[in-house]
């Protein structure tokens, strides 16, 4: 009798909560920030996992669209302009980030239809 209790397993290598959830975003850090931020008296164990998953999904979505915008402009590096184009051309992201100003993002190219030259139906001879 070695005093170990009833034949329990030896503790193996520790595994982060992010890797358990299959996420890249840090679940532990988000949990700490939720506790320190005084958002609520208590924070459940699932809340930081869910929040990390949502944040990771949004980041992946924006980066995917910004990468496409960069490729369309024949660039290999994403700049704020590509982020702006990606967000403003996507209906849902534009609604979510409508109050956000992106520094060095520029504006969407848009010319009102009335300002465009008239299409003449008859050809001049």
Curated annotation (Swiss-Prot):
Q: Where is the composition biased (Basic residues)?
A: 1-18
GO cellular component annotations of the record? nucleosome; nucleus
Q: Does the keyword Protein transport apply?
A: no
Would you identify the family this protein belongs to, as annotated? Belongs to the histone H2A family.
Against InterPro entries, the record matches this protein to: Histone-fold, Histone_H2A, Histone_H2A/H2B/H3, Histone_H2A_C, Histone_H2A_CS
Q: What does this protein do?
A: Core component of nucleosome. Nucleosomes wrap and compact DNA into chromatin, limiting DNA accessibility to the cellular machineries which require DNA as a template. Histones thereby play a central role in transcription regulation, DNA repair, DNA replication and chromosomal stability. DNA accessibility is regulated via a complex set of post-translational modifications of histones, also called histone code, and nucleosome remodeling.
Carrying N5-methylglutamine, the residues are 104
Looking up SMART domains in the UniProt record yields: H2A
Q: Does the keyword Phosphoprotein apply?
A: yes
**Pfam families linked to this entry:** Histone (PF00125), Histone_H2A_C (PF16211)
Protein name as catalogued: Histone H2A
SUBUNIT field: The nucleosome is a histone octamer containing two molecules each of H2A, H2B, H3 and H4 assembled in one H3-H4 heterotetramer and two H2A-H2B heterodimers. The octamer wraps approximately 147 bp of DNA.
Which Gene3D superfamilies does the UniProt entry name for this protein? Histone, subunit A (1.10.20.10)
């Amino acid at each position: 009798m070695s005093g170990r209790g009833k034949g329990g397993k030896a503790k193996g290598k520790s595994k982060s909560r992010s890797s358990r959830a299959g996420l890249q975003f840090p679940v532990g850090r988000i949990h700490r920030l939720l506790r320190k931020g005084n958002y609520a008296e208590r924070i459940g164990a699932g809340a930081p996992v869910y929040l990390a998953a949502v944040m990771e999904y949004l980041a992946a979505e924006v980066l995917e669209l910004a990468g496409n915008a960069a490729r369309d402009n024949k660039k290999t590096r994403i700049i704020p302009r590509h982020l702006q184009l990606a967000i403003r051309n996507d209906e849902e992201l534009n609604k979510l980030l409508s109050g956000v100003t992106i520094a060095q993002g520029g504006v969407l190219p848009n010319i009102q239809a009335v300002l465009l030259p008239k299409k003449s139906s008859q050809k001049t001879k």
